[in-house]
């Protein structure tokens, strides 16, 4: 089954494709207080919700990058409907291959919930710091361990113990790079339940509407496995947060 088709189906009901909520995203947008025309880059932008809200609230310019053709198409549709005059572009590409026109040229550089693009949280912070201007913002969304992960969970989820750090370790990774941690938006159990539950719901609706899709057996199997892993271990083992860092002034 095509990877991006899978995520398009399972995340079809999500506005934000991460285990956070729209209220927290709105608070992040309000917190930033960006000037009109500020330049923003969002790596692995999903359906473009962060960029669109920043354009609506502050009149920013920006580029969103994502490897999913389904998400880029949805982001373009939303841009045309909500901010048709905004200088916002969405680009279909691997975020790791994105190269800004100049280093340290963006007021905001973000990668929320997709550190796998760069090979982990610390590498993501390195990449974003290289894009962010002096006194700019580096924003990362990242899981963290709530407790020592059971071996059964690691096997079921296909993870290793060093896949994530603690909440404090995620924050300290930015501070070691000279970034100032100014805020975190930590997800609740309800945020996680909504994120996971919408995937189950969307899958069920898709199965009912497309009974002849040859990908249904794989789709059902993957979602059922992920559901069981989440309910047995994941909900009590993995947290998630948006980390908001400020760069040093020039």
Summary of predicted features, one role per range:
Residues 44-48:
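Class I SAM-dependent methyltransferase "Motif I" SAM/SAH-binding loop
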Residues 18-36:
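Conserved alpha-helix/loop element of class I SAM-dependent methyltransferases that forms part
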Residues 49-97:
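Class I SAM-dependent methyltransferase SAM/SAH-binding core
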Residues 163-178:
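Short alpha-helix
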Residues 100-109:
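A short acidic, Gly/Pro-enriched loop at the edge of an enzyme's catalytic core
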Residues 143-161:
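Short, glycine-/aromatic-enriched active-site segment of Class I SAM-dependent methyltransferases
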Residues 183-250:
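Conserved Class I S-adenosyl-L-methionine
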Residues 122-137:
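A short glycine-rich, Lys/Arg-flanked "PGG" loop and its adjoining helix->strand segment in the class I
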């Amino acid at each position: 089954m095509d990877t991006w088709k899978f995520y398009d189906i399972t995340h079809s009901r999500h506005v934000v494709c991460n285990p956070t909520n729209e209220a927290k995203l709105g608070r992040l947008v309000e917190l930033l207080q960006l000037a009109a025309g500020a330049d923003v880059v969002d790596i692995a932008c999903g359906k473009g919700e962060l960029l669109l809200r920043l354009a609506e609230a502050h009149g920013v310019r920006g580029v969103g990058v994502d490897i999913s053709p389904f998400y880029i198409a949805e982001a373009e549709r939303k841009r045309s409907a909500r901010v048709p005059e905004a200088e916002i572009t969405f680009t279909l590409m691997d975020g790791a291959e994105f190269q800004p026109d100049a280093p340290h040229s963006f007021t905001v550089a973000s990668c929320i919930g997709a550190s796998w693009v760069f090979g982990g949280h610390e590498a993501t912070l390195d990449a974003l710091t290289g894009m962010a201007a002096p006194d700019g913002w580096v924003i990362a969304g990242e899981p963290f361990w709530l407790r020592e992960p059971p071996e059964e969970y690691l096997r079921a989820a296909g993870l290793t113990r060093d896949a994530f750090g603690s909440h404090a370790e995620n924050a300290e990774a930015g501070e070691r790079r000279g970034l100032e941690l100014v805020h975190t938006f930590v997800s609740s159990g309800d945020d996680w339940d909504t994120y996971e539950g919408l995937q189950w719901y969307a899958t069920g609706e898709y199965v009912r509407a497309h009974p002849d899709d040859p990908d249904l057996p794989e789709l059902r199997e993957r979602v059922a496995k992920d559901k069981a892993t989440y309910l047995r271990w994941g909900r009590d083992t993995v947290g998630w947060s948006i980390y908001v860092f400020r760069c040093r002034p020039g």
